[in-house]
Amino acid sequence: MEVQALTRYARMSPKKMRDISRIIQGRKAAEAADYLALIPRKSARLIAKTLRSAIANAENNNNLSADALTVKLALIENGPVLKRFKAGARGSAMPRRKKMAHIRIVLTDGNSN
């Protein structure tokens, strides 16, 4: 059975988050959570929070054991972009693009129900 958790509008560039999400894909959920706790990056904290939510969804909504769960998919999708301007040289304005990401984590217990 598959269980998922979704965090939308995370204020971080998707490119920075994808490095971490690739590492946890295919690992046991508990092992991935321990691994993310050791990485000193903001993206690791955001992904770990979503992973904990997915584990809680599996335990509370579907009565699955946390020990049997595996990270099937850790997907970082592009979110909307906030367009801002910063003062530039000679009175001009320089555009700044503040990117957002959507984090989707899918866990599976190995059974195809």
Swiss-Prot record:
**Keywords, in A-Z order:** Ribonucleoprotein, Ribosomal protein, RNA-binding, rRNA-binding
Q: Which CDD domains match?
A: Ribosomal_L22
A cellular component term from Gene Ontology for this protein is: cytosolic large ribosomal subunit
Q: Specify the superkingdom.
A: Bacteria
- InterPro entries xrefs: Ribosomal_uL22, Ribosomal_uL22_bac/chlpt-type, Ribosomal_uL22_bac/org-type, Ribosomal_uL22_sf
Molecular function terms in GO for this entry?
A: rRNA binding; structural constituent of ribosome
Pfam families recorded for this chain? Ribosomal_L22
| Presence of the UniProt keyword Nucleotide-binding in the record | no
Q: Name one GO biological process term.
A: translation
Indicate whether RNA-binding appears among the record's keywords.
yes
The entry's family comment says:
Belongs to the universal ribosomal protein uL22 family.
NCBIfam families associated with the record: rplV_bact (TIGR01044)
Its assembly, as annotated, is:
Part of the 50S ribosomal subunit.
Give the function comment from the record: This protein binds specifically to 23S rRNA; its binding is stimulated by other ribosomal proteins, e.g. L4, L17, and L20. It is important during the early stages of 50S assembly. It makes multiple contacts with different domains of the 23S rRNA in the assembled 50S subunit and ribosome.
Its protein name is Large ribosomal subunit protein uL22
Q: Which gene encodes it?
A: rplV
